[in-house]
């Protein structure tokens, strides 16, 4: 059975390739989406790739993923450090989530060291640039395979 992964991207990620390339790299969000689609095909996953600068959109999409029994690969961007709403959405949707960040948030400003989202995810990948998205998809594919082999759903953190 092919599993769907919602790849959700938070604020300012639409500016990738132009915004602080020394921190975030030169890949655009379109480049990352294309890479994710290629990787998903090899992993037998379907992806639904989305970006919004609005917290409520991300919350609604997480809820939608839960309703569709999909997985979530999320780069909440700055909302990692501020959004109790995204934390609560993940917890209430009981959806399997991997959090990804292009930069190593622990090697940056102190206010970026804490993520409200991390506590309700299966895992966090940070500091590997655009490759982090592919690592996240591989992790979710492994979880899907484990669920299929065990005949059960492994939800939440």
From Swiss-Prot:
Annotated Gene3D superfamilies: Dehydroquinase, class II
Residue sites binding substrate per the record: 75, 81, 88, 102-103, 112
GO molecular function: 3-dehydroquinate dehydratase activity
UniProt keywords, alphabetically: Amino-acid biosynthesis, Aromatic amino acid biosynthesis, Lyase
PROSITE patterns for the chain: DEHYDROQUINASE_II
Known catalytic reactions: 3-dehydroquinate = 3-dehydroshikimate + H2O
Pfam families from the UniProt entry: DHquinase_II
Site (Transition state stabilizer): 19
Chain coiled-coil ranges: none
Catalytic residues identified in the record: 24 (proton acceptor), 101 (proton donor)
Pathway listed: Metabolic intermediate biosynthesis; chorismate biosynthesis; chorismate from D-erythrose 4-phosphate and phosphoenolpyruvate: step 3/7
Enzyme category, top tier: lyase
Record InterPro entries: DHquinase_II (IPR001874), DHquinase_II_CS (IPR018509), DHquinase_II_sf (IPR036441)
Single GO BP term: quinate catabolic process
Record EC number: 4.2.1.10
CDD domains: DHQase_II
Stated family: Belongs to the type-II 3-dehydroquinase family.
Function, as annotated: Catalyzes a trans-dehydration via an enolate intermediate.
Subunit-structure text: Homododecamer.
Protein name: 3-dehydroquinate dehydratase
Originating organism: Brucella melitensis biotype 1 (strain ATCC 23456 / CCUG 17765 / NCTC 10094 / 16M)
Gene: aroQ
């Amino acid at each position: 059975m092919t599993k769907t992964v919602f790849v959700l991207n938070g604020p300012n990620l639409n500016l990738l390739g132009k915004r602080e390339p020394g921190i975030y790299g030169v890949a655009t969000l379109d480049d990352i989406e294309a890479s994710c689609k290629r990787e998903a095909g090899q992993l037998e996953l379907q992806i639904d790739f989305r970006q919004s600068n609005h917290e409520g959109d991300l919350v609604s999409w997480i809820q939608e993923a839960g309703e569709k029994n999909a997985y979530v690969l999320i780069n909440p961007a700055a909302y990692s450090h501020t959004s109790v709403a995204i934390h609560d959405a993940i917890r209430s949707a009981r959806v399997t989530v991997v959090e990804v960040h292009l930069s190593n948030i622990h090697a940056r400003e102190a206010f970026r060291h804490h993520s409200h989202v991390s506590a309700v995810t299966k895992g966090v990948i940070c500091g590997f640039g655009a490759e982090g998205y592919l690592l996240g998809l591989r992790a979710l594919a492994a979880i899907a395979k484990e669920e299929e082999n065990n005949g059960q759903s492994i939800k939440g953190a």
